[in-house]
Amino acid sequence: MYAYEALPVAEWFRRNRELAGFHNPTRALYQTIRELTENSLDATETYGILPTIYLRVNIEDEQKGWVSVYAEDNGIGIPGNEIPNVFGRVFYSSKYKIKQHRGVFGLGLKMVVLYSQSTTNKPVLVRSATLKSDKIYEYQIMIDTNSNSPIILDRREYPNRYKWHGTAVKVYLEGNWLAAKKRIEDYLKRTAIIAPYAEIVFKGPDLELWLKRRTTKLPPAPKEGLPHPKSVDVDTLKQMIQESRGLTLLEFLMENFDAVGEGTAKAFLEWAGFNPNAKVTALTPEELVKLVDKMKQYEGWRRPRSDWLSPAGAELLEIGAKAILGAEAVFAITRKPESYGGHPFIVEAAVAWGGQIPPADKPLLLRYANKIPLLYDEGADVARKVVDEFNWQNYKVKFPAPLAVIIHVCSTKIPYASAGKEAIAEVPEIEKEMKLALRDAAKKLRLYLSRKEKEMEMLNKYISLAKYVEEIAYNLSMITRIEKESLAKNLHTLIERKIGLTIEELVKHTLSMSSTSQEEVVEATPQ
């Protein structure tokens, strides 16, 4: 006979840590940096604080492959009595609300702790203080995987003399720095693109980054909302009914769902064949299933609210891409809110051109979900499909070209293609919005390139004519006895009038993409 037993949730995740991105020492180190950075960003920008984040990786034992990771932020901090559960209890989080978060399950920090203690048997060190707190709390914590509860190895309190607020975390883990280094660098730089209001300082064994704050403008913070009628399942509905005893169906719909007023609720119940005055607790199991089916089918609901979401915004995308990619020009678009299955989402796209972007046979793609850079599984992402199928020739782009594409999806529920959460699935509504966003951004690029072509034509015409100015001025000077320099200056002015732009204006707009050498332009320019 088989012996049956229940596996505690913390132990299950410890055994299946690859589901949270902790596949091996390389991915684990990258994932640790990612989890700590994203928690720091959520603890700052969501509360109107400009993020300042310090990160450090040290080699602790080269023979064992042990490294330490330290992260510190200036966020709102964690109340002292909550620190043990936040770091030591799986599925304990402040993120179980209907609004946009970087994290989804409240699992990331706990997976860092589980991986750390599984590979080094060392606790996580946490120090935190909330806004205006008189005390700083410090803990050393491990997780009891059998009871899914924190093990507090040490607890201390310090007076907060300088009114510091934020959270500092230090963990020891098995990690491959050399293999993870490039991914970590890419991740932090891509984070700086979509969050140019953050200052991120990173120090590794042989890598230092100082990603400066480029703007003080923060994106709007997402608001917490009620579920949309199309987004619930039977179990969710049953839980909501248990908390709504005594309500009629009409009252239940109005109080528990987003954008459902009395008129909308009455129209739906009449269409679905339900008595609006029936007690919601009196619904039979069959009626519950019918109610959910009808809620999904009904087309009279309003769209989900967009203030649950926090897109980066075209301005911040342009600032970030120019700063980090060194692009000559960036054109960004934020689409209007749409929904899939009752879940609101917004797609943003940006195209970056020229500058320090190297020419390639296809666009460099930078993918984001809820402001999180996605670095793995690019081939499985619907964004890669959209970019590859896009007809770039219609927008004056000829490959190889110095082109980068940024696609960001923000939603209360990102439809990931796999448990690794590194690629967005092919949801028709999201794919359509990606295509439209990319088209809108590419139209702006086409206008820009068309103008550059015309300016290049004029610059080449100027250079062709200007090559003869010195000789003509010399000959005219011999005939008229007028100074050659004065004649040359007048001839250059005549050419500029004919073209309609000064040489300084032409060079400013076109030199960076011109096939004409800088020496040619300098030679043809009046000194």
UniProtKB/Swiss-Prot annotation:
GO terms for biological process: DNA topological change. It catalyses: ATP-dependent breakage, passage and rejoining of double-stranded DNA. This is Type 2 DNA topoisomerase 6 subunit B. Relaxes both positive and negative superturns and exhibits a strong decatenase activity. Keywords: ATP-binding, DNA-binding, Isomerase, Nucleotide-binding, Topoisomerase. Its EC number is 5.6.2.2. Homodimer. Heterotetramer of two Top6A and two Top6B chains. It is an enzyme of class 5 (isomerase). HAMAP family: Top6B. GO terms for cellular component: cytosol; small ribosomal subunit. GO terms for molecular function: ATP binding; DNA binding; DNA topoisomerase type II (double strand cut, ATP-hydrolyzing) activity. ATP binds at N39, D73, S94, K95, G103, V104, F105, G106, L107, G108, L109, K110, K421.
